[in-house]
Amino acid sequence: MNIILLGPPGAGKGTQASRLIGKYAIPQISTGDMLRAALKEGTPLGLEAKKYMDQGALVPDSVVIGLVKERIQKPDCSKGYMLDGFPRNVSQAEALDMMLGELKQRIDGVVCIEVPNKELLGRLTGRRTCRSCGAGFHVMFDPPKTDGKCDKCGGELYQRDDDNEATVSSRLKVYEDQTKPLIDYYEKQGKLRRIDGVGSMDAIFGRITAILG
């Protein structure tokens, strides 16, 4: 089973991904991990990517597709794989389809975890971090015993800049703008599986596995 996992920041994608790879015994493939591995191993594609990264430029799609192609031909992908964080746009999705066609493979399903923006804002802006020890809390899901104080060391809890409402709203808008055309692309192919991402992690996992089989 070859699947793609989509979902906005705060949708619980990471939790579901780790459970899915356990259930289906398939590896999770992220472009970040692939790039780091290629750089460490000094592969031709890794060296090619390094040229762009050293200049602070984005690694071209052709290089990323090459890395994906190498990765999915490894033995641990024989039963399938889950792509996480790729493709990010329609041009990448088209290039991926073309490459998979050459390998006589295809994407079987695209799981899109959907959560209303109001819920996502609550999840993402509710995070609090201890200034002293770095421990993490959440005002809704994991509140400290004393408001504003760390349970572990008594340090002051604060909201990081990237967790404030303006920054979170901006991140969600970027995701929406980038991903909407991608969702439409896979919907037209009949591969999109929309999942209600509100509820317990167990309930959401159950919805995903019910659709994937």
Swiss-Prot record:
Enzyme Commission numbers on file: 2.7.4.3
Binding site for Zn(2+): 130, 133, 150, 153
Keyword terms: ATP-binding, Cytoplasm, Kinase, Metal-binding, Nucleotide biosynthesis, Nucleotide-binding, Transferase, Zinc
Region (LID): 126-163
This protein's name: Adenylate kinase
Phylogenetic classification of the source organism: Bacteria, Pseudomonadati, Thermodesulfobacteriota, Syntrophobacteria, Syntrophobacterales
Pathway given in the UniProt record: Purine metabolism; AMP biosynthesis via salvage pathway; AMP from ADP: step 1/1
Family of the protein in this entry: Belongs to the adenylate kinase family.
Subunit structure: Monomer.
SUPFAM superfamilies: P-loop containing nucleoside triphosphate hydrolases
Keyword Metal-binding annotated: yes
Organism this protein belongs to: Syntrophobacter fumaroxidans (strain DSM 10017 / MPOB)
Entry's Gene Ontology cellular component terms: cytoplasm
GO biological process, any: AMP salvage
Region (NMP) residue spans: 30-59
Domain notes: Consists of three domains, a large central CORE domain and two small peripheral domains, NMPbind and LID, which undergo movements during catalysis. The LID domain closes over the site of phosphoryl transfer upon ATP binding. Assembling and dissambling the active center during each catalytic cycle provides an effective means to prevent ATP hydrolysis. Some bacteria have evolved a zinc-coordinating structure that stabilizes the LID domain.
